[in-house]
Amino acid sequence: ARFWMTFGQEYLTHLRVIQNIGMSRIDPIMYNGQEIVPIQFLKAVLPNPGDLGENYTGETSIGCRIRGIKDDKEMTYYIYNNCSHHAAYLETGAQGVSYTTGVPAMIGAKLFIQGVWKKPGVWNVEEFDPDPFMKELNEQGLPWHELFNIDLEL
């Protein structure tokens, strides 16, 4: 399995410029006799990300591409979810990145509170039965899809 994220060239260029001009620094610097932290200054002058959802277009795409051997045969498996920024905004007033972050966190909390995910000790969410979580994803607006034995470009 492999985790990856992709971004448009314009977005990557902006990130590179921010880094190259030192605005991603987290150490304090002196500016006009004031100590400031560049990344905190940048946050103060940029628009609040929560206010940008109305103009987002396109979709998020979150998935796992898996390749391995099963029953002595090479197999591929792709499980994924696409989420429309526009649909997420209409439902919540937030864009798809916020939606795909918040909904899974809510589901995890719900399963814990309901006692579905509860064991003595300390556990990571990945150690619990995934089936109730996957069922809830479908019911809470993040339906997932599966593709088998396709070219995954791995």
Regions found by a protein language model. Give the residues of each.
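C-terminal catalytic/substrate-binding lobe primarily of soluble NAD(P)-dependent oxidoreductases
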Residues: 1-154
